[in-house]
Design a protein with these regions (language model features):
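Active-site loop/helix belt of alpha/beta enzymes
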Residues: 77-79, 85-191
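Active-site-proximal beta-alpha core segment in soluble small-molecule metabolic enzymes
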Residues: 1-124
Length: 194
């Protein structure tokens, strides 16, 4: 969530869980008093920042390696999601590595809430049937990892795939509140179409 004003508005409507891409965005949410359920969806090695955030908010952090697990544990984080590469190789462990990382996280004193993955490479696939099929393939990697890792959370998706993602327990659709006009090419359910 890049706008604390918008996040506060959503909270007034009953929304309690927020996802952010950077520690700075999480800091903004915390400063705005939105501390119930925050997800830092990108890995960080900044233990000092993690420590400060963990003291002030209920934060879950994405981890995808020994180094990010060690940083989370050293920073006082209590909960993590194992970030799994589902086809966009910018972060996330390989699906086969997820169970071992979950065990490492647990042995480091962290609660493994589940898994997350980001199919960002599919967000702007304009053909809905193709987007649905490719999203299902990406999410099959994630749900298989979830079966191996355990936990209650399967987090993923995005604004461009929320309408075809049937596998996740939570969707990370960050642009949904404003729905940039770029998404009009996808024929997504939108207030502009009502």
């Amino acid at each position: 969530t890049k706008s604390t004003t918008l996040a506060r508005h959503l909270a007034e409507g009953g929304h309690r869980s927020f996802c952010a891409a950077t520690p700075r965005e999480i800091e903004g949410l915390v400063a705005a008093g939105l501390v119930d359920d925050l997800l830092l969806a990108n890995e960080t090695l900044d233990t000092a920042r993690l420590g400060a955030l963990s003291e002030r908010a209920n934060i879950t952090v994405a981890v995808d390696s020994r180094a990010t697990i060690e940083a989370a544990a050293s920073g006082g984080v209590r909960s993590v999601l194992i970030d799994v590469n589902v086809g966009l190789p910018r972060c996330g462990c390989e699906p086969a590595e997820a169970p071992a990382l979950a065990e490492l996280a647990r042995s480091s004193g962290l609660e493994v809430r589940g898994v997350m993955g980001y199919e960002g490479h599919l967000m702007m696939v304009t053909d809905r049937a193709e987007r649905a099929q490719r999203t299902a393939e990406a999410m099959a990697l994630l749900t298989h990892a979830a079966d191996e890792v355990g936990g209650d959370v399967v987090s993923g998706g995005g604004t461009g795939t929320f309408d075809v993602n049937t596998s996740c327990t939570e969707i990370q659709a960050g642009s949904y509140a404003l729905l940039d006009t770029d998404y009009d090419t996808l024929d997504l359910p939108s207030p502009r179409r009502c």
